[in-house]
Design a protein with these regions (language model features):
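Beta-rich, blade/repeat-based domains predominating
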Residues: 155-168, 199-211, 242-262, 292-317, ...
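The canonical Cys-X-X-Cys-His
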Residues: 68-79, 113
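Extracellular beta-sheet/turn segments enriched in Thr/Pro/Gly and aliphatic residues
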Residues: 25-48
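A short, solvent-exposed loop/turn motif at the edges and junctions
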Residues: 2-24
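C-terminal capping alpha-helices of c-type cytochrome domains
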Residues: 101-133, 169-171, 264, 320, ...
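Short loop/turn segments that connect beta-strands within beta-propeller blades
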Residues: 185-189, 228-232, 278-282, 334-338, ...
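A short helix->beta-strand "capping" segment at the edge of beta-propeller domains
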Residues: 134-158
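Conserved beta-strand positions in repeat-built beta-propeller and related beta-rich domains
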Residues: 171-177, 215-221, 257, 264-270, ...
Length: 430
C-alpha cells in the first residue's frame, strides 16, 4: 500500500534469524514464500543490542555502574562494535580522557576502568561472552507498525540530532557536525541540503515558531538561528542576555503556540540558566535557576555541573518546565512572573533528560541514568515511576507525548521506540 510501481528487493529480518532477501518483487505482491534459518556465530552476535553488550561490563556495586552510565554514555552507546575499536590500554585511556577527562568518575573507578573495559571489550574477551539469546518475536501492536527509513545526507556525513516537521510538510533535520540541515520530502524521498551561515556551528535543536519559521540552537556558537522556509533566509542572534554576545551551549528550545508573543524558550547546558528570546526584537531574558540547596526534596547531583537540558511548555497553564541532567532536578518557570517564580524538584531517579508535558499537564521525564521514566503531577507534587525492561542497562534519552496522551520513549540503549499508554499502563516495544 502506497508503494511506487517499481520492483523491490525484499528482506526479512527477525532477531535470532539470518537475513534473507528476495529480489525483483513487484509492488502489490501479496503471496510470497521466504525460507528462514537460525542465525549462528558472528551473524547472531552482530544482532546483540548495546544494552546487552553494556551488561557484560561488571562493576562492584550498582552505584558505581550508575556513575559510569551518567558520565560515559551521554552521546553514544556502550559496548557496540564502534565502541570496541581501541586496541591497547593507552588507546582506551585516550578515548576516555577525550570524552570526559575522568573528571566525573569516582576515583576508585578511574583507577580500574581501563582494565575493566579491556577485559570486557577487547576481541578475545568478546569471544568469551555468553551466547546472545534473542528476545521473543514481536506480537500484538508491535507487529502492526510500518517504519519508513531514509539515509540522510551524504554517506558517512550524517550526524543528525533533532528534527521538526515544517508547515510545508517537509521534515527538517539538523546535522550537528556539518553545519547544515536537510529538508526531506517524506512523500517523494527528495532531500535538499540547507547550509547555515558560515559563522555559526553545531545546530542542535529545531522548532517551528508561531509564524511558521524554524528556530535552531547553534550550541557550539552560543547563537540562535531563524530560518524562513519561504524565502530561505537566515537571521542569527546571540542566545545570551545583553551585554553578552553569546551563550555557553544553547540546547533544547520550545515555543508555546498559544503565546501571543511567540517567545522562544531554551535551556543552556553550559550554565545554570534558562532563557526566553523575543522572535522580533531578539531581546533575550535570562532566568537564573536555583542552586542545589533550594530544590524541593534537596538531594545531590550525580556528576559535575548542573546541565539544564530538556524543556517544554505546559499546554494547560503555559508554565515552562525544564530538567537538569547532572543537577538531577526538574524545574518550573512561571512566564507571567517577573522573576519566573522558579521552583525545582528532585526526582526519585537519576538523570532527568529531555522531558515533555502531556495534554493534561502531567510532566513526563526520562530517567536516563536509572533506565526508567516517570510522571510528575504539578498539583500534588507526586511522582509515578515506571521501569523499562532491563532497566539497569537502558539509557532513555528523550520522550514525547502525543495528542492522545500516549508517551513515546527513545530506547537509546537498544535501538527501540517504546509506546506507553498511561491509562492501561501497558508498554509496547517497537
Amino acid at each position: 500500500s502506497g508503494l511506487r510501481n517499481v520492483d523491490y528487493n525484499v528482506r526479512t529480518r527477525l532477531m535470532g534469524l539470518a537475513d534473507e532477501w528476495v529480489s525483483d518483487v513487484a509492488a502489490g505482491t501479496i503471496d510470497m514464500v521466504i525460507q528462514t534459518r537460525a542465525a549462528v556465530g558472528e551473524e547472531l552476535e552482530v544482532q546483540r543490542p548495546a544494552s546487552s553488550a553494556f551488561s557484560m561490563l561488571a562493576f562492584d556495586n550498582p552505584r558505581d555502574k550508575l556513575n559510569f552510565k551518567m558520565n560515559c554514555s551521554y552521546c553514544h552507546q556502550v559496548g557496540t562494535l564502534g565502541f570496541r575499536t581501541p586496541e591497547k590500554p593507552v588507546d582506551w585511556e585516550t578515548m576516555l580522557r577525550r570524552m570526559d577527562g575522568f573528571g566525573g568518575l569516582y576515583p576508585h573507578t578511574q583507577n580500574t576502568i581501563i582494565g575493566r573495559l579491556m577485559n570486557t571489550y577487547k576481541d578475545d574477551a568478546v569471544d568469551k561472552w555468553p551466547k546472545f539469546v534473542p528476545p521473543p518475536a514481536p506480537r500484538g501492536l508491535a507487529t502492526a507498525a510500518t517504519i519508513t527509513m531514509w539515509e540522510m545526507d551524504k554517506p558517512l556525513e550524517g550526524s543528525f540530532h533533532d528534527l521538526e516537521i515544517g508547515r510545508d510538510g517537509l521534515v527538517y533535520a539538523v546535522n550537528i557536525s556539518r553545519r547544515r540541515m536537510i529538508a526531506l520530502d517524506p512523500t517523494s524521498g527528495k532531500q535538499t541540503a540547507i547550509e547555515f551561515p558560515s559563522h555559526v556551528h553545531a545546530p542542535h535543536s529545531i522548532e517551528t515558531a508561531n509564524d511558521g519559521s524554524l528556530w535552531t540552537t547553534m550550541c557550539a556558537s552560543g547563537k540562535m538561528a531563524r530560518y524562513d522556509i519561504e524565502t530561505g533566509e537566515f537571521v542569527v542572534c546571540g542566545s545570551a542576555e545583553a551585554p553578552r554576545k553569546r551563550g555557553n551551549y544553547p540546547h533544547t528550545l520550545r515555543i508555546n503556540p498559544k503565546d501571543p508573543e511567540g517567545l522562544i524558550w531554551y535551556t543552556d547546558a553550559g550554565s545554570n540558566s534558562c532563557f526566553s528570546l523575543h522572535p522580533k526584537t531578539h531581546v533575550v531574558k535570562e532566568y537564573k535557576l536555583l542552586s542545589a540547596g533550594q530544590a524541593m526534596g534537596a538531594g545531590r547531583g550525580e556528576s559535575r555541573g548542573i546541565t539544564p537540558y530538556g524543556l517544554d511548555y505546559s499546554p494547560v497553564d503555559g508554565m515552562i518546565w525544564y530538567s537538569k541532567l547532572n543537577g538531577n532536578r526538574i524545574g518550573r518557570i512561571n512566564p507571567d512572573a517577573s522573576d519566573g517564580d522558579i521552583r525545582e524538584w528532585n526526582p526519585p531517579f537519576r538523570g532527568p533528560r529531555r522531558l515533555h508535558v502531556a495534554p493534561d499537564g502531567m510532566v513526563w521525564v526520562p530517567g536516563f541514568g536509572s533506565g526508567v521514566f516517570g510522571n510528575f503531577d504539578p498539583n500534588t507534587e507526586k511522582w509515578t515511576v515506571y521501569e523499562l525492561p532491563d532497566a539497569e542497562n537502558q539509557i532513555p534519552y528523550a520522550l514525547n507525548v502525543d495528542k492522545d496522551g500516549v508517551v513515546w520513549i527513545c530506547g537509546t540503549g537498544n535501538d527501540t521506540i517504546n509506546r506507553f499508554d498511561p491509562v492501561t499502563e501497558t508498554l509496547v516495544e517497537f
